Amino acid sequence: MEFVVFEPGEKYQRKNRKWQGIPGIERTPDGILWVTWYSGGHGEGPDNYVIVVCSKDGGKTWSKPLLAIDPPDDIRAFDPCLWVSPDGKLHLFWSMSKNWWDGIGGVWTMVAEKNIQGDLVWSKPSRIADGIMMNKP
């Protein structure tokens, strides 16, 4: 299932988002602020996706969306959370479920690490648990 968008286009830009919910924020050891939330559609439902942006100047300015989690069909992505683990890695968690809640939805994660060139590289997404998670581990 391909649902990670590494170069979010027009659909994910501010002018096309009617609402935003469940924000999360984290600061990585290099001082960068990372923010996530979910949006899409006219409220909770199958058009929901997760967005990630960052600020390198303490929150004065923000990047365009750097990453979107946008599942296909009637599966929604929601309730994202960011966490920096003790080893300094940035983790993104989110839930996915069919429509509102299908009883078998789950929590997913991706981990970002800097490569040898200093660029941030995200791992492949993986499902880690059943249910929903709205707080840091």
Enumerate the predicted regions with their spans:
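Asp-box/BNR beta-propeller blade signature and adjacent active/binding-site loops
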Residues: 1-137
